[in-house]
Amino acid sequence: MESVIFSINGEIIQVNKEIITASPYNFFKRIQEHHINDEAIILNGINYHAFESLLDYMRWKKINITVNNVEMILVAAVIIDIPPVVDLCVKTMIHNINSTNCIRMFNFSKRYGIKKLYNASMLEIINNITAVTSDPEFGKLSKDELTTILSHENVNVNHEDVTAMILLKWIHKNPNDVDIINILHPKFMTNTMCNAISLLGLTISKSTKPVTRNGIKHNIVVIKNSDYISTITHYSPRTEYWTIVGNTDRQFYNANVLYNCLYIIGGMINNRHVYSVSRVDLKTKKWKTVTNMSSLKSEVSTCVNDGKLYVIGGLEFSISTGVAEYLKHGTSKWIRLPNLITPRYSGASVFVNDDIYVMGGVYTTYEKYVVLNDVECFTKNRWIKKSPMPRHHSIVYAIEYDGDIYAITGITHETRNYLYKYIVKEDKWIELYMYFNHVGKMFVCSCGDYILIIADAKYEYYPKSNTWILFDMSTRNIEYYDMFTKDETPKCNVTHKSLPSFLSNCEKQFLQ
């Protein structure tokens, strides 16, 4: 019986010539045309046992592919060009791809030009980017490859600070490619992370490129009232879907987002004041009742800073309160601050440089009802008076933007809405052009370059140019609207001395 001799790494294997003749694959057709009898055909880059498996497939149309042998069989099938076996191997590898092997699969697919495996491994890296940074192979990704991965619209990062930590870890292994840092968008980063990068001697150039990472864009949470039940919905920029998170039957409450959880504070249920605070995780949709506030109150002013929820003032039955307290996320104890100088409800509170500013609202007792224009600032553990607002306002909505405060007033006793800017360093109020007039609730959010206002429609106000853009949007029955990013960066005053500790904490929090 005639046979063809193959030599693989010094080992000889004889193959019946009839198998070669019957083969439909180009590799074996070429052997039929050019093979010289008795001359061994040397096969390089192929495993002996993998070649045996391919011969079995040619004989019986069956092949035993496992996790342990799939790579060597695939290499042999690619070199010898047996498409059915290539497809079987690729399917096996894709089925078993995970965050611990996806970079190796990615490199393997590039080496042998396997597009399906390349796409699947790239998708796995994109979906598990924070986990794959622990892979020793992560630092071997090229600058262009990492740029492609981090520029993908669906890369699984939920804040630009996370992108920064991924880049810093890669730069540690690739110090000659520090300019990759320019793919960051500083306007989506915290000041703390920007300072840390600056202390490392890195400079982020101002980018005019569009933001491609959907996950770092603003999430939206909306509470809408319908038939006495309010429905909570959450919009994820990464998935581009709205999901129903849950319902609440409260009225006259306030709400805030902190660490991807929505806190619903105080208010009334069935016309009765409550002092409980409920929290729903916007990702898992799980509810938790946290420790009660110090008293029953509604129409409180709330703000968040450094992982803490602050509740200030409010209405205790018919009397305004000056109580100020905060709850740190993940803890169960409310911490009291000194009381406000002037008790109030329905005012606004906002943080600027770790100081709390409270403005406007109503001071009321059983005998008095006073609409306020005064402003208080909590700094160095005490409340101090600041320059009053230009007018008295019972309803105020305020937001910090670029180190100053922008305040929009509601309409009750007033005849129209007002827009003010409070210049913090000068303790000075100035009045700005107000584009619209709206009777009813409003919601104000800081969104990078602009301030978003939800009123009778959607408005974008650009402070630097003092311009407005109007968008048609149904706002009926909206009880709460907020845009937020998932900021969980440890907050501290980063210095050269504290920088290693800060980066270590960020790596543990973001990348493990």
Curated annotation (Swiss-Prot):
PROSITE patterns: BTB. Pfam families: BACK, BTB, Kelch_1. Residues 102-176 form the BACK domain. Kelch repeats lie at residues 216-261, 262-307, 309-354, 356-403, 405-449, 452-498. Residues 2-67 form the BTB domain. Keywords: Kelch repeat, Repeat. Belongs to the poxviruses Kelch family. This is Kelch repeat protein C2.
